[in-house]
Structure formats: structure tokens, C-alpha cells
Curated annotation (Swiss-Prot):
It comes from Staphylococcus aureus. It comes from the Bacteria. Pfam families: RepL. CDD domains: HTH_CRP (cd00092). Keywords: DNA replication, Plasmid. One of its GO terms (biological process) is DNA replication. This is Replication and maintenance protein.
Length: 158
């Protein structure tokens, strides 16, 4: 079985034309069902609808969904920039981001957040696997850098 671009070659079959009696040999090709190149974005419409109803936290979530880069599921913005863009207080942004982090919806580093690719992403199965790995490592890299910085600080201090 040969797979190419989602198509699987299944062999050949002989068919008989009812009118002429001619035997025709045809190749049987089946298209493989794959997840393919997709954008999961149904949540955006739901959040938009809820945003119209109200809620400062929903405005922040909607802003994140509208501004996340679908190439890598990240958004570069400080909490102050998000507060200004959404017309919410800095404390509301901080609280909302903390809730999203605790719910494993986002992970954060200074000035950057990454949206969980299980919630929203664009791409195929391979890209989803890649983004899931990146999401898993996203916070870890920041923690390692912070630990290294603290280690350097304490070694310099002593």
C-alpha cells in the first residue's frame, strides 16, 4: 500500500461495460481520511458572542484569541498592553491570565504567552504534535532561565 498526499493506492479492478462487453481495467484509489490542514476556531465565535454579553475577563480572552499568531500559537504583549487594548484594569488582566494559566489554557514568559494547541491551532497532525511539545516546554524554558539567573545572582552575591 502506497501513501501519497493522503491518497492510498489499493490496486486494480476489472470492470465490464454492460453495453459493449468491453473489459476495462481500472486503478482503485481511495482518499485517506486525515485531520489535514485545519483551523480549529469555533471557540472564537463563542467567545465573541459572550464578549458582547459582557465581562471584562471575556474581553481579555477574546483579545488573546484574536491576536495569537497561529503559526506558533504565541502572542507577544505585556499585561499593560493587554489592559490598554481591552480597556480593562491591569489587575483584571493579571487575574485573568493567572486563571488561564491554572486551567492550562496558556503558559507565560515575560511579555509572551502561548495558547494551548488543544484549544486553538492551525495546521496538520505533525504541526499539532510539534506545538504540543513546544507548549509543554514553554514554561520550562522560562523556569530554567530564572533558576540560572538566580544561581548567577547568588554566586555573585557570595
Amino acid at each position: 500500500m502506497k501513501e501519497r498526499y493522503g491518497t492510498v493506492y489499493k490496486g486494480s479492478q476489472r470492470l465490464i461495460d454492460e453495453e459493449s462487453g468491453e473489459v476495462i481495467e481500472v486503478d482503485k484509489l481511495y482518499r485517506k481520511q486525515t485531520s489535514g490542514n485545519f483551523v480549529k476556531a469555533y471557540i472564537v465565535q463563542l467567545i465573541s458572542m459572550l464578549d458582547m454579553i459582557g465581562g471584562k475577563k471575556l474581553k481579555i480572552v477574546n483579545y488573546i484569541l484574536d491576536n495569537v499568531h497561529l503559526s506558533n500559537n504565541t502572542m507577544i504583549a505585556t499585561t499593560r498592553e493587554i489592559a490598554k487594548a481591552t480597556g480593562t484594569s491591569l489587575q483584571t488582566v493579571i487575574t485573568t491570565l493567572k486563571i488561564l494559566e491554572e486551567g492550562n489554557i496558556i503558559k507565560r514568559k515575560t511579555g509572551v504567552l502561548m495558547l494551548n494547541p488543544e484549544l486553538l491551532m492551525r495546521g496538520d497532525d505533525q504541526k499539532q504534535k510539534y506545538l504540543l511539545l513546544e507548549f509543554g516546554n514553554f514554561e520550562q524554558e522560562a523556569n530554567e532561565k530564572q533558576e540560572n539567573a538566580l544561581s548567577d545572582y547568588y554566586s555573585f552575591k557570595d
